A protein has these predicted regions:
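A short, conserved beta-strand element enriched in hydrophobic/aromatic residues
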Residues: 299, 379-380
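A beta-strand-loop signature enriched in Asp, Gly, Thr, and Trp
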Residues: 399, 404-449
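Glycine- and other small-residue-rich loops at beta-strand/loop junctions that grip anionic moieties
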Residues: 193, 381-382, 416
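N-terminal localization/anchoring segments of enzymes in phospholipid and broader phosphate metabolism
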Residues: 2-363, 367, 371, 395, ...
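Helical hairpin unit composed of two closely spaced alpha helices linked by a short loop
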Residues: 372, 382-404, 408, 413
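Extended hydrophobic-aromatic, low-complexity segments
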Residues: 386-390, 404-406, 414-418, 436-437, ...
């Protein structure tokens, strides 16, 4: 079904809400049922083991002790380890067995091996094209070391000759994306966490169909959870019938596995290797305020033109090739990227993988906080952080740096809002300023520091983004649009309510209790 609505573009799905009966007997209902049956089986096996092991009391103690020693000596976040220890103390045998199950997941190992291989191949693809690292070392050796770390952790070097445009709202990004898509001559790559039919996606899809008819290669990669939340399991087939290559990343199957914990949270658009977009804006109407869900939706994005676009081209191709035997990077990187020779500064696109052991997203944020001299201004939808990030925020403020966070005034997830408030008191005590955006929901992921550094991307200050998602961002140094980012922060701040210890005390008791309980298991959520 290909419907067109006036001014809203194409639709591939029928409008209408599904009733309870349809939901129960849908593919999602079947998968949920199979999940529950498998969980019931696992719980039964664990319960049987729990009943059997007490007959060998000494064996139970030794078994738990071995698991605890292994946990304490393994790599990982100390807060997460503490959470597991609490779990062990509440349910000793079940907790230990469940921990072993999550650690032995085969899907995780296969994903890690494949991403490592792709990074190795990608490093050779971009090495010959980047010469900015030496210039950065001459400009700022400390930041050059961070760039070297990012290049070593992944395969994305620092670039010069790249113009960056900052969009303070999703509507602004959308207005720039449409003409960029219409100008495509060779290829269009779209990678998004959420795609939902409506005005935004409808207009984009209409352009993609026209471009396919003109011989442009179009690829769309969507996170697999969209099959249940916004699209249908056969949506890739519907797209392919239109000539658009479409994939779901890690589609959810009816098998219990921690493999599904790793989601593709990135938002990338690349056109002909000349233009790239990233930021918090997905392809759904709430991101451009055509649909109001949590008040005004405040989001941000950037558009790159110039050499750094090559990194986003490779970033997309790496993710596309995860379930394939070969990667076609050389064919698309062969298209010459036009450098913007008069564009000052440095741009460093980077990605963060949950399976390689390098927490690049968190390290870049901490690096900015540790280097700042005057201010670090942050916009984030969530604040569910580990000890390292909390300490970095506190230490920067205690050094006299103006550390100021803007969070939502109207949350999209009440549990996340409760968890965020559990961090407020300790941060404010150290001098960190926190404000909440009263008109609605902040979905922006922005760091800006000292009028010369900034990050705009997809990386939230929460465990999901920092530990469990595939993410991406653009780091900028001495780029003119950094002034626009700081100006937007100040403009947004005027619409915020400053949080104080007194206001925090007025939180509802239910919110305080929920936050305290959830904080104990936050790393496992």
């Amino acid at each position: 079904m290909n419907d067109r609505e006036e001014g809203k573009g194409m639709r591939l799905l029928r409008k209408g809400k599904r009733g309870l009966i349809q939901a129960i007997f849908s593919r999602l209902g079947l998968i949920v049922l199979l999940f529950l049956l498998q969980l019931a089986l696992l719980l039964g096996l664990f319960s049987a083991a729990a009943e059997f092991l007490p007959h060998f009391f000494g064996g139970t103690i030794v078994f738990n002790a071995i698991i605890v020693i292994y946990l304490l000596n393994s790599e990982g976040d100390p807060t997460a380890k503490l959470t597991w220890l609490v779990f062990f103390s509440v349910a000793p045998v079940f907790g230990a067995l469940f921990y072993l199950y999550t650690k032995s997941d085969i899907g995780h190992r296969l994903l890690r091996e494949r991403t490592t291989q792709l990074i190795r191949e990608g490093r050779s693809d971009l090495r010959a094209h980047a010469s900015a690292q030496q210039h950065l070392e001459e400009r700022d050796p400390q930041i050059a070391r961070m760039a070297s770390y990012i290049a070593k952790s992944g395969c994305y070097p620092v670039w010069e000759h790249t113009a960056v445009t900052y969009f303070p709202l999703g509507e602004d990004k959308f207005a720039a994306l449409l003409p960029a898509l219409r100008q495509a001559k060779h290829f269009i790559f779209l990678e998004y966490f959420i795609v939902e039919e409506g005005e935004m996606w409808g207009q984009v899809l209409s352009i993609l169909v026209e471009k396919v008819k003109q011989g442009v290669e179009v690829r769309v990669l969507v996170d697999g959870t969209c099959e249940f939340t916004h699209l249908t399991h056969d949506y890739p087939r519907r797209m392919q019938e239109l000539g658009i290559k479409c994939k779901m990343f890690a589609p959810v199957r009816p098998f219990v596995s921690t493999h599904y914990n790793y989601r593709d949270h990135r938002k990338i658009a690349v056109i002909d290797g000349q233009v790239a977009f990233t930021g918090g804006v997905n392809l759904a109407d709430e991101y451009i305020n055509r649909v109001v869900r949590f008040g005004h939706w405040k989001d941000t994005a950037v558009m790159l033109r110039g050499e750094a676009v090559r990194s986003f081209t490779l970033m997309f191709l790496n993710m596309w090739a995860i379930d394939e035997h070969t990667m076609e990077s050389s064919r698309f990187l062969a298209y010459p990227t036009k450098p913007v020779m008069d564009a000052p500064g440095f741009v460093l696109p980077y990605s963060d993988s949950p399976v390689d052991g390098n927490k690049v997203g968190e390290q870049v944020y901490i690096d900015i906080l540790s280097r700042a001299r005057r201010y670090v201004h942050i916009m984030t939808p969530y604040l569910i952080i580990d000890h390292n990030m909390e300490t970095a925020l506190q230490y920067a403020a205690e050094r006299g740096v103006d550390v100021h966070l803007i969070l939502p005034g109207i949350p999209d997830k009440k549990y996340a809002f409760s968890l965020a408030h559990t961090h407020y008191a300790s941060l404010m005590k150290a001098g960190v300023k926190i404000s909440e955006y009263t008109p609605g929901f902040v979905h922006a992921k922005v760091f800006v520091a000292d009028d010369r550094e900034a990050v705009v991307g997809t990386i939230n200050l929460d465990y999901r983004s920092l530990y469990h998602h595939f993410e991406c961002a653009a780091y900028m140094l001495d780029v003119p649009c950094i002034a626009d980012i700081e100006a937007d922060f100040q403009h947004t701040l005027k619409q915020c309510r400053r949080m104080t210890p007194e206001r925090l005390k007025n939180d509802k008791l239910s919110m305080k209790v929920a936050g305290a309980l959830l904080k104990a298991i936050a790393p496992l959520m």
